[in-house]
A protein has these predicted regions:
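Sec-dependent N-terminal signal peptides
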Residues: 4-13
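Single-residue signature of alpha-solenoid repeat helices
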Residues: 35, 88-89, 159
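Long amphipathic alpha-helical scaffold segments
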Residues: 116-139, 143-194, 199-201, 206-209
């Protein structure tokens, strides 16, 4: 019995040491968010225990370094003044907020040796996020509208992706939904499929219908639609012939 308890104790000890080592390594390699996730996981439900003190110190360090790095990157990108950086800046602000939200439920975190709480310089990023969301939506909307002018299917598809992202971050922005439908309609490749009977037998109507029922195969997707009957109002982009040689 004592032997089993000793083995269990040693196993738990090595697991704890390994987790601390992984968190330290993540910080040293600059993987601050990984270190934060590891520390938070080990502090959940255990933050007052002595064995979790190293995680509090590492969490404080990783958070400070991660926030500083993100703020420096934002400052650089803003100085560059390139509208293509708006999405990157927006996502960094989201990351800053998400990081704080991950730590907040654990507070306060007391550092025993200092007899004080760990310090986390939390900031309110809501205004910055809302402002960036508006600027980014406007920028992507303008890009999408410009792509419409080219009248090429590939550009309509690119416009659709820009509009789709706007819809994700800023639902129902201007006429985004209407433009998405238009971009999709104009970006589709239509394929006309015909069947040639080479069997020297009469193909049963039901079999022919089943073979040309493309919904069954799941071939149609966002940008490709197959037709077995010609639509006079559609200009087909591709033709496909099915040669039936054996029934």
């Amino acid at each position: 019995m004592k032997k089993h308890l000793l083995i269990l104790f040693l196993t738990l000890f090595f697991v704890a040491c390994n987790s601390i080592k992984k968190t330290q390594e993540a910080i040293h390699k600059g993987n601050y968010d990984k270190a934060i996730s590891l520390a938070v996981r080990n502090l959940n439900g255990n933050k007052t225990k002595k064995k979790t003190q190293p995680y509090i110190l590492m969490l404080e360090e990783a958070f400070g370094k991660a926030s500083q790095r993100d703020q420096e990157e934002i400052a650089f990108l803003k100085k560059d003044a390139n509208p293509e950086n708006l999405e990157r800046i927006y996502n960094i602000y989201l990351r800053l907020k998400e990081r704080q939200q991950k730590i907040k439920p654990l507070l306060p975190l007391k550092i025993s040796k200092k007899k004080a709480n760990a310090r986390f310089d939390f900031k309110n990023y809501d205004e910055a996020i809302i402002t960036l969301k508006k600027e980014l939506s406007n920028h992507l909307y303008s890009k999408a509208k410009a792509l419409f002018a080219s009248n090429h299917k590939y550009d309509y598809r690119k416009a659709y992706e820009e509009l789709k992202y706007i819809e994700e971050i800023n639902p129902n922005y201007r006429d985004t939904r209407v433009l998405m439908q238009e971009a999709n309609a104009k970006g589709i490749d239509y394929v006309y499929v015909s069947m040639k009977n080479e069997t020297a037998q009469v193909v049963p109507k039901k079999l022919e219908k089943d073979l040309l029922n493309f919904d069954t195969y799941g071939l149609n997707d966002l940008w490709t639609v197959y037709h077995s009957k010609r639509d006079t109002e559609i200009r087909y982009d591709f033709g496909l012939s099915l040669n039936l040689r054996k029934i």
